[in-house]
């Protein structure tokens, strides 16, 4: 016979009013916080990724494609210098 872990059954947790009071506040708050994090551009600053309009400058409009894997470092350096 299996023992018990002493934890509440999941069905008791999901049907409790306390669970829904807490989660009806936290889930929308997390969604709104994530939306603000991305829409204000803070996510770009935190993770250091370029914004969509910064991928290609006016001077460089071609794709930076590496063709030869054995000379990849040299090709990347040439693409950066352009």
Swiss-Prot record:
Query: Where does the record say this protein resides?
Result: Cellular thylakoid membrane
Name used for this protein in its record? Cytochrome b559 subunit alpha
Its GO biological process annotations read: photosynthetic electron transport chain
Source organism per UniProt: Nostoc sp. (strain PCC 7120 / SAG 25.82 / UTEX 2576)
Q: How does it sit in the membrane?
A: Single-pass membrane protein
Cite a single Pfam family from the UniProt record: Cytochrom_B559
Gene of origin? Answer: psbE
Cofactor binding note: With its partner (PsbF) binds heme. PSII binds additional chlorophylls, carotenoids and specific lipids.
Q: Which SUPFAM superfamilies match?
A: Cytochrome b559 subunits
């Amino acid at each position: 016979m299996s023992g018990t872990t002493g934890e509440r059954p999941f069905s008791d947790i999901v049907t409790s009013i306390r669970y829904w009071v807490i989660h009806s506040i936290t889930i929308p708050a997390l969604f709104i916080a994530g939306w603000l994090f991305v829409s204000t551009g803070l996510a770009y600053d935190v993770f250091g990724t370029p914004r969509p309009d910064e991928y290609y400058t006016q001077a460089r409009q071609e794709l930076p494609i590496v063709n030869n894997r054995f000379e990849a470092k040299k090709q990347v350096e040439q693409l950066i210098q352009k």
